[in-house]
Amino acid sequence: MAKKTVAAKKRNVKVDANGQLHVHSSFNNIIVSLANSEGQIISWSSAGKMGFRGSKKNTPYAAQMAAQDCAKIAFDLGLRKVKAYVKGPGNGRESAIRTIHGAGIEVTEIIDVTPLPHNGCRPPKRRRV
């Protein structure tokens, strides 16, 4: 006789009009997350999730597509205003924020939260092409 499996219960996230936008832009990928005011994730997307591979993942167009996918879900759930938190040195940071604004979600402020070392780890060596 087969064991009964319990399906994982989907989390209920309370969505109000205000929220947070987190854009994590590394040298290899871009991750866009929209959260409510408590910080619980409403929707997320990344360039890799949208089907981009390799060096195409860190392009402004890939960031635009990821932000569009993320914003559509959150807008339908009722999110209207966000504070944008941008982290990382990669391309497409501004592109993602512009796309969110274009989708009907108002960006009230943009905060750069890129971690800066106080001379921590040695950076990777320069590429010789």
From Swiss-Prot:
The keyword RNA-binding applies. Disulfide bonds: none annotated. One of its GO terms (cellular component) is ribonucleoprotein complex. It comes from the Bacteria. InterPro entries: Ribosomal_uS11, Ribosomal_uS11_bac-type, Ribosomal_uS11_CS, Ribosomal_uS11_sf. Belongs to the universal ribosomal protein uS11 family. This is Small ribosomal subunit protein uS11. It comes from Bacteroides fragilis (strain ATCC 25285 / DSM 2151 / CCUG 4856 / JCM 11019 / LMG 10263 / NCTC 9343 / Onslow / VPI 2553 / EN-2).
